[in-house]
Amino acid sequence: MCSGVSPVEQVAAGDMDDTAARFCVQKHSWDGLRSIIHGSRKSSGLIVSKAPHDFQFVQKPDESGPHSHRLYYLGMPYGSRENSLLYSEIPKKVRKEALLLLSWKQMLDHFQATPHHGVYSREEELLRERKRLGVFGITSYDFHSESGLFLFQASNSLFHCRDGGKNGFMVSPMKPLEIKTQCSGPRMDPKICPADPAFFSFINNSDLWVANIETGEERRLTFCHQGSAGVLDNPKSAGVATFVIQEEFDRFTGCWWCPTASWEGSEGLKTLRILYEEVDESEVEVIHVPSPALEERKTDSYRYPRTGSKNPKIALKLAELQTDHQGKIVSSCEKELVQPFSSLFPKVEYIARAGWTRDGKYAWAMFLDRPQQRLQLVLLPPALFIPAVESEAQRQAAARAVPKNVQPFVIYEEVTNVWINVHDIFHPFPQAEGQQDFCFLRANECKTGFCHLYRVTVELKTKDYDWTEPLSPTEDEFKCPIKEEVALTSGEWEVLSRHGSKIWVNEQTKLVYFQGTKDTPLEHHLYVVSYESAGEIVRLTTLGFSHSCSMSQSFDMFVSHYSSVSTPPCVHVYKLSGPDDDPLHKQPRFWASMMEAANCPPDYVPPEIFHFHTRADVQLYGMIYKPHTLQPGRKHPTVLFVYGGPQVQLVNNSFKGIKYLRLNTLASLGYAVVVIDGRGSCQRGLHFEGALKNQMGQVEIEDQVEGLQYVAEKYGFIDLSRVAIHGWSYGGFLSLMGLIHKPQVFKVAIAGAPVTVWMAYDTGYTERYMDVPENNQQGYEAGSVALHVEKLPNEPNRLLILHGFLDENVHFFHTNFLVSQLIRAGKPYQLQIYPNERHSIRCRESGEHYEVTLLHFLQEHL
C-alpha cells in the first residue's frame, strides 16, 4: 500500500534544510524582463513558422519539359508578413550529390491580402479564433484542378485567378481578379462547384448563395436571415457551422457541392446540387460578451448552448439550381427530406461531418447522438428530398412521388461507453452499376480502443416505405447488414485521424497511405498498406523526427514537414521509386528541399524527453528543460507547464522552439521546466484519454505530481519547495486544481483563461467528457474549481489569474465568478485582464505583457 503523502509532498511541506543549495534566479526590473522577452522574440523570428502548407500537386503534361509537377501552396515569402499563394516547379531529374533548394515563386503580383489595418469582419475574426489562426494574408483557398481555378478570401472580399488547365501555366506573377457582389457583409466559405467551375457558393448573412464567376450573376438560395442584424431576431442559418460544431467538432462548413451534375428536360438544363445544414437556434440561450468596441460600451451577442441546455434544431436540406447552355441560372429550388429530419433520425443531436460520394449517387453524413457514444454513417439518395412547399397537399403529392424503395441507409455504426472522437477518415468507393454492395474505408477507434483502418462492405438492402405516412423508425430501422469488415491496421498505436488528418487512396494499386504512430507515440510517420490484401505496413518517413505529409494526386511524390525536439522544421519533397509490379515497396528518395532547418538561437537548448511508470503502472511521457545555469548540487525553482486535457499531446519529438519558446526563456533564467502528458492526453488510445470520463480535474494532478517526483529523483536539481504550476485554458483549470488539492506541492499557480465552473461551459465539449449535469452532479461539483476556493491558500502572492476580457469560448464569466467566490471566502489573489483579447492572446503587445508578467511573478514569488 502507498502512504497517503507522496515523497514530493513530504519534501515540499517544509523548507529545504540546506538553503545554500538553492539556486536563486537573478531578479530583473520590469524593463529588464521586457528586454529579455524582446531578445528571445527577435531570435525566434529567425525560425518562426513560415513553412509552406496546404499543398496541391499538379502534373505538367509537357513530356519534353524539364518539370514533372507544379506544386502550389500557401506560404510566407522571405521578408513578407503575410501568407500568399505560391508555387514551385519540381524537376524531372535531380543530381544525387547536390541539394536542390526549390525556389518559392509568387503567383500573385503585388497583392495585399490582409484587410486595411488588419481589421476583419466579425465573422472572419470569430472563424480565425475557431481555427486558431495567427497568420495574416491568404489563409485558405479552393482549387479546381481541371480548370486551374483558384478562389480565395482576401481584404474582406473574394478573388480568383487561373493557372494550368486549358490556358497553360503562367511564367510571371498575375493580378488576381476581384469578384464583385451586390451583397452587404462578408462572403464566407467560398467553394468552387466541382461539376461546373463557372459557379461557386458562399455564405452571406447566414444564408447560402451561388454566383457565376464569368457572368457575375448571383442567386440567393436560402431565406433564413430576416434582414435584422440582431441575434435574437435571426435564430436560423443555412450552410453555417455553429459555434459548438466549429469549436468542439472541427467542422467549419455547413454546405457541400455535389461533385456531379445531371441533365434534365428537352432543353438539356443542367442541375447542380448543394447539400446543406439548416440550423434553428431559437431555443438556444443568448449570452452577451463585451465587444471589441469597449469605448462604445457595446456587447456582442452569441447563441451559446451551456451544458444540459437545449442545442440547436438541425436538418439536412438540398439546394438545387438549373442552368442553361449560357450558364444562366434558370431556376432554383429548396428541398427537404421527405419526412422531418427529427422524425427520421430522432436520436441525432449533431451532424459531425457530411459530403457526397464521388459519383454523386448519395449524399452522406455522420450523425452523433447527444451523449456522443453512438455514431452513424448514413447515405441519403437525392431522390429522398422533396421541394419545400407551404401547403400540406403539395407536400403529400411530392411525398407520393418518391419511389417506395428510396430510403436512407445506415451503412456503419460506432458505439462506445467512453466517447467518440469525430474525424474525417471515410473513403467511399464508386458503386458498381446494378450492385447492392457498397464498399468504403473507415477509421474506427471504438472497436479496439485504438484508431485503426478498416475496409467495409455493406449490402444496401431496401424496404418499401409509404412516405406519405408518418414513420416512427426503430433503433435499427435503416441499418444495412455488413458483409465484410477487414482490419487493415491493428495494435496499440493510432492511425492519425483527428485535427484534419487525411488518408490517400490509390484505387489502381489498391494501396492506402496514412499517417500514424506505429513506431512510437512520440512521432508521426507516413505509412502505406494494401487495402485488398491487408498485411505488411511499410513506413515511408525517417525515424527520429515527427512528420506531417501530403501526397501527390498521382501517388508518386509526397511532401513532408518534419522536425524533432532538436531540429527546427524542414520541408522536403520525396519521390517514390521502384518496380511498378510491387508498388507497396516503392522507396522514398529525397528529391528536393522547399525549406531547410534554420539555425537555432544561440541560447536555445532543446528539452529532453523522458518516460516513467506511475504507481498504477501506467507509462507516461514528459520533457524537461534543464536550467542553462546548472551547477552541481544546486536546486532550481521549477515550473510545471501543463495542459492535461483531451485532444492534446504536448510531449512528442517535434520542435518546441516556436510555439513554446517561453519555456526555453524560463530555462535560460535558471528555472527547470517540466511538461508531462498524463492520462487524458491524446495519441495513446481511447481508454488512456478516457481516464477523464465523468471526472475532469480529479485524476490529472496525481499524474503531474508523480512526474515531478520522478524528475526530482532522476535529475537531482529540482527544488520541490519551489514549484509553480502554469497553463492556459484546460491548463489554467488544472493550475487552479493543483493549488486547491496540492497546495503543499505547488507554491504558486498561474492560471490562464480557466474554466472554473463546468455548468457554464458548452454542450458539445462538456457533455462528451462529463455527461449532462443531472447524470453526474458529483463530477460537476468536484471538477468546478470555483466551488472549492476555501481550499486555496491564505498566503498572498500564490495565485495569479489571467484572462482575455472578450473571450467568447471560455467566457470571462468564469474568472468573474471565481473572483467573486475568492472575495467571499477572503482569499488572496492577483488578476491580470487583457481587455482586447479573446481566448488566445493575438496582439503582439498583449503577448509580450503576458510573458513579462509571468516572469515577474515567478521571480518575485517562487
UniProtKB/Swiss-Prot annotation:
EC number, UniProt record: 3.4.14.5
Main location: cytoplasm
Annotated residues for binding of Val-boroPro: S729
Effect of S729A: Decreased levels of global dipeptidyl peptidase activity. Homozygous pups are born at the expected Mendelian rate and display no obvious morphological defects, but none survive to weaning
Biological processes annotated in GO: negative regulation of programmed cell death; proteolysis; pyroptotic inflammatory response
Localization per Swiss-Prot or TrEMBL: Cytoplasm, Cytosol
Gene3D superfamilies: alpha/beta hydrolase, Dipeptidylpeptidase IV, N-terminal domain
GO molecular function: aminopeptidase activity; dipeptidyl-peptidase activity; identical protein binding; serine-type peptidase activity
Active site (catalytic residues): S729, D807, H839
Catalytic activity: Release of an N-terminal dipeptide, Xaa-Yaa-|-Zaa-, from a polypeptide, preferentially when Yaa is Pro, provided Zaa is neither Pro nor hydroxyproline
A GO CC term assigned to this protein in UniProt: cell leading edge
Keyword line: Aminopeptidase, Cytoplasm, Hydrolase, Protease, Serine protease
Assembly and interaction partners: Homodimer. Forms a ternary complex with NLRP1, composed of a DPP9 homodimer, one full-length NLRP1 protein, and one cleaved C-terminus of NLRP1 (NACHT, LRR and PYD domains-containing protein 1, C-terminus). Forms a ternary complex with CARD8, composed of a DPP9 homodimer, one full-length NLRP1 protein, and one cleaved C-terminus of CARD8 (Caspase recruitment domain-containing protein 8, C-terminus). In the ternary complex, only one subunit of the DPP9 homodimer is bound to NLRP1 or CARD8.
Free-text function comment from the UniProt entry: Dipeptidyl peptidase that cleaves off N-terminal dipeptides from proteins having a Pro or Ala residue at position 2. Acts as a key inhibitor of caspase-1-dependent monocyte and macrophage pyroptosis in resting cells by preventing activation of NLRP1 and CARD8. Sequesters the cleaved C-terminal part of NLRP1 and CARD8, which respectively constitute the active part of the NLRP1 and CARD8 inflammasomes, in a ternary complex, thereby preventing their oligomerization and activation.
Family recorded in the similarity comment: Belongs to the peptidase S9B family. DPPIV subfamily.
PANTHER family documented for this protein: DIPEPTIDYL PEPTIDASE 9, PROTEASE FAMILY S9B,C DIPEPTIDYL-PEPTIDASE IV-RELATED
Protein name: Dipeptidyl peptidase 9
Species the sequence originates in: Mus musculus (Mouse)
